[in-house]
Amino acid sequence: MATVKVRDVVFGAGAPKICVPMVGRTLDQLVNETEVLKVLDFDLAEWRVDFFEHVEDIEEVKSALFEIRARLGEKPLLFTFRSKREGGQREVSDDYYGALNKALAQTGEIDLVDVELFQEQSVVRELVDTAHEHGVKVVMSSHDFARTPVKEEILMRLCRMQELGADLPKIAVMPQNASDVLVLLDATNTMREHFADRPFITMSMSGLGGVTRLAGEVFGSALTFGSAVEASAPGQINAADLRNILNLLHMQT
């Protein structure tokens, strides 16, 4: 399987990389979050722009991005607008979703962009092309906050993301019981052994799925999310604790 390098971070080699989301609603809150990140051990930051109060003004988003980028130094930055139907804070039109992500990919200030698999397919294809034209990696994602699909469905979505040009396919699902967590882990292992030609990301959410955020090196997931100020999804573990646990598990593998 190939690796994916973003700045100095290599996905698909060694322990899962740690991504810390920034979820500030105002620019001041975002600036405060970047100050907290300065003392954390993590690999990349994610700006969850759907939390931002001015998210429907592209110029305001760009202005905030320039401030964030300047404060993050050489840490890679993932830009994410999470739609409400996939667990985010708000819904926008397909046209605006495409325009926002395209405009930010063209700034040269982000390293990765999240593209939801189930957005309008013409929008998905255009965003993948635009991102790659500007040297931006694509995290293509699917989130199910209601259930855990069957193993075959999880594999189908991840393989479809590869076909569409995702650099890092990603799926997050909600478990109802321990068996659901095992379904996600089994799918992850099967993806790694039989279908993946690039790093990918999987997780089972909530406290019940917490083990999947820790076991990526064993089963095949290349990235995990840890919280700093506020979690962006159920089950996220504090980033400092996450690093300690991942390091311990890495020494045993």
Curated annotation (Swiss-Prot):
GO terms for molecular function: 3-dehydroquinate dehydratase activity. Pfam families: DHquinase_I. 3-dehydroquinate binds at E46, W47, R48, R82, R213, S232, Q236. Keywords: Amino-acid biosynthesis, Aromatic amino acid biosynthesis, Lyase, Schiff base. The active site is at H143, K170. It catalyses: 3-dehydroquinate = 3-dehydroshikimate + H2O. The keyword Cell cycle does not apply. Coiled coil: none annotated. It comes from the Bacteria. Pathway: Metabolic intermediate biosynthesis; chorismate biosynthesis; chorismate from D-erythrose 4-phosphate and phosphoenolpyruvate: step 3/7. CDD domains: DHQase_I. Its EC number is 4.2.1.10. The keyword Metal-binding does not apply. Involved in the third step of the chorismate pathway, which leads to the biosynthesis of aromatic amino acids. Catalyzes the cis-dehydration of 3-dehydroquinate (DHQ) and introduces the first double bond of the aromatic ring to yield 3-dehydroshikimate. Homodimer. Belongs to the type-I 3-dehydroquinase family. This is 3-dehydroquinate dehydratase. The lineage of its organism: Bacteria, Pseudomonadati, Thermodesulfobacteriota, Desulfuromonadia, Desulfuromonadales.
